[in-house]
Structures are given as structure tokens and as C-alpha cells.
Amino acid sequence: MKKVLLLLLCAAMLLTLAACGSVKNVQTEEVASERYSQKDIEAAIGAIKKEFVRNWNGCTLTEISYAGDDVSENHREWAERNGADEVIVLTSSFDVAEQGASPSLNPGQTYTRWMWILVRSEGGAWEHVD
């Protein structure tokens, strides 16, 4: 009986791990910025990678990069709306698995130019808001 329970527990753990979003082979492109240092941009990308692994089951992040200073400036209201003083916008591409992904995404589809909006205050940690 103990062996059966152990096998079931192991199988459940494997299924849980398999359902996570994947960022293993994600490509990043450096984009010049007058607003943010490369370290700031990398921190924002890191926040989205964590978000993707935790919440984007059945998806594989393939590319992510800074959308540019103009795009971030055009989304300035997101900082104000969220009580922050900075906003950064990233764009990405990701693949959706045939099965096991969110029902709001099309199975087997590749999404491109997906926007991620993050905010922060006083140089703190980036927070994904949209």
C-alpha cells in the first residue's frame, strides 16, 4: 500500500512540474534605452520569466525583449494607476501546447508581440500588472 501511495505521489509531482510554463530556451534581444539600464531591463525580464513558469501552464516562452522607450512612455498611466513611478513594457513570443494550456489561449498557436506591463517605485522590484 505504501508503494502505491508513493507512486501516486511521484506521478502527481511529475504532472505538476509538467504543467509549468517553460523558459528554458528563451531568447532575449538587447534593446538600447535612455530610460533604463540593461540591469533594469534584465530584472523586468526575470520577473516575467518567474511569472511565466508559475502561471503559464502548457506554454513555452521563446523570445522576450524590452519594447523600447517610446512604448514604455506611451504606457505611463499604468504606473500612475498602480501607485508606482516607473513603467516598463516588454514584448514576447510564446508557443501554446496542443493540450494542457489555459482555455483562453488557442491550442497549438504561437503568440507574437505579446505585451507585458510592469511597474515599480523608487527603483524597487518590478511588478507585473498586465
What are these regions, as identified by a protein language model?
Residues 1-4, 8-9:
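Positively charged n-region of N-terminal signal peptides that target proteins for export
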Residues 9, 18-110:
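Flexible low-complexity loop/turn motifs enriched in small/helix-breaking residues
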Residues 111-130:
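Short beta-strand edge/turn micro-motifs at domain boundaries
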